[in-house]
């Protein structure tokens, strides 16, 4: 059985939950031997402890620092792109290769269908996203979710295919950054990302981008130009990671918490700045605590956004998308 990953700030809660579990086990195993008043006293203690656990849970997860949200975004049990694809869509057909060099396993994508039997909504879509691994072997296979140039070119090929068949595009972003190796630079990493930005701005079909975990720098923006930009509640999106920012400004990774605060990289930060359009709520404790509930929430929001975008003409989509991104980063100077 795999060991549960516990983050530093979660340890007090986990310890209290373990104590609660022991008390419940004690009550179940010895209830027949205990006197009624002893069992009642233990039950009262359990009730008191349950309230303490819930109060501590609320206190921790409703007051997360920016760095703690970065940690949650990187949680190894968090749902990844393929998890969401299989929970949200049906009839997924994965497509491979960039038709130039190779098939980058850090990017996955293909046609699928989003359906809702209650509302009757049914829409074929192209889903594309970064894919990380769960262990050392799969992370090496997926290159830790860091795409090569051929990954971004594969993504663009699939986007153009979706445009040809008039199908909306959904991108799921979760990467620590584009792969920075020499071989990636030699094959045109910067050009591949820049080309995606240029082409995505002009796509004549609806494009919805969702940051589901990490959204680091050019590796994220290479899949991040769309009509709607959504962010999971405990994800982050920034030009640089807190550790890299800390190492540049303070010559040490020890100031990553301060860097995270300065970068303002969380979903509420970016919503207030007009960078994203909507926050996708997560279950208490993060998406990994209830993946299916998280997928259900995201599916409902995607259906809402698709329903709003599908009636728009190609010209309306392109014009509003270009205007949306052109207006970012505008500020006024006073004094």
From Swiss-Prot:
Identify the pathway.
Lipid metabolism; malonyl-CoA biosynthesis; malonyl-CoA from acetyl-CoA: step 1/1
Query: What biological-process terms (Gene Ontology) are attached?
Result: fatty acid biosynthetic process; malonyl-CoA biosynthetic process
| This protein's UniProt keywords | ATP-binding, Cytoplasm, Fatty acid biosynthesis, Fatty acid metabolism, Lipid biosynthesis, Lipid metabolism, Nucleotide-binding, Transferase
Catalytic activity line of the entry: N(6)-carboxybiotinyl-L-lysyl-[protein] + acetyl-CoA = N(6)-biotinyl-L-lysyl-[protein] + malonyl-CoA
Q: Which residues form the CoA carboxyltransferase C-terminal domain?
A: 48-308
Q: What is its EC number?
A: 2.1.3.15
Q: Which GO terms describe its cellular component?
A: acetyl-CoA carboxylase complex
Q: What is the enzyme's class at the highest EC level?
A: transferase
- Describe the family membership recorded for this protein in Swiss-Prot or TrEMBL: Belongs to the AccA family.
Assembly: Acetyl-CoA carboxylase is a heterohexamer composed of biotin carboxyl carrier protein (AccB), biotin carboxylase (AccC) and two subunits each of ACCase subunit alpha (AccA) and ACCase subunit beta (AccD).
Its recorded name reads Acetyl-coenzyme A carboxylase carboxyl transferase subunit alpha
Q: Which organism is it from?
A: Chlorobium phaeovibrioides (strain DSM 265 / 1930) (Prosthecochloris vibrioformis (strain DSM 265))
Gene responsible for this protein? accA
């Amino acid at each position: 059985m795999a060991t549960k990953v516990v983050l530093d700030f979660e340890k007090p809660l986990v310890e209290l939950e373990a104590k609660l579990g022991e008390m419940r086990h004690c009550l179940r195993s010895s209830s027949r031997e205990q006197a009624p008043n002893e069992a009642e006293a233990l039950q009262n203690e359990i009730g008191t402890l349950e309230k303490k656990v819930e109060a501590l849970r609320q206190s921790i997860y409703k007051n997360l620092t920016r760095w703690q949200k970065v940690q949650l975004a990187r949680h190894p049990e968090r749902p990844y792109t393929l998890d969401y694809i299989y929970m949200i869509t049906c009839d997924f057909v994965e497509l491979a290769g960039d038709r130039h060099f190779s098939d980058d396993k850090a990017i996955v994508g293909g046609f699928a269908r989003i359906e809702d039997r209650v509302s009757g909504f049914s829409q074929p879509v192209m889903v594309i996203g970064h894919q990380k691994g769960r262990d050392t072997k799969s992370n090496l296979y997926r290159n830790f979710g860091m795409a090569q140039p051929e990954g971004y070119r594969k993504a663009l090929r699939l986007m153009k295919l979706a445009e040809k068949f008039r199908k909306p595009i959904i991108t799921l972003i979760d990467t620590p950054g584009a792969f920075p190796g020499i071989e990636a630079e030699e094959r045109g990493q910067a050009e591949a990302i820049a080309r995606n930005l240029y082409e995505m701005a002009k796509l004549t079909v609806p494009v919805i981008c969702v940051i589901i975990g990490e959204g680091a720098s050019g590796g994220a923006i290479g899949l991040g130009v769309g009509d709607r930009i959504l962010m999971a509640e405990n994800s982050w999106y920034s030009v640089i990671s807190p550790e890299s920012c800390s190492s540049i400004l303070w010559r040490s990774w020890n100031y990553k918490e301060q860097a995270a605060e300065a970068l303002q990289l969380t979903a509420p930060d970016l919503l207030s700045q007009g960078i994203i359009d909507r926050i996708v709520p997560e279950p208490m404790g993060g998406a990994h605590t209830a993946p299916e509930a998280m997928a259900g929430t995201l599916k409902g929001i995607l259906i809402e956004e698709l329903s709003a975008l599908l009636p728009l003409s190609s010209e309306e989509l392109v014009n509003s998308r270009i205007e949306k991104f052109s207006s970012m980063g505008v500020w006024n100077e006073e004094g």
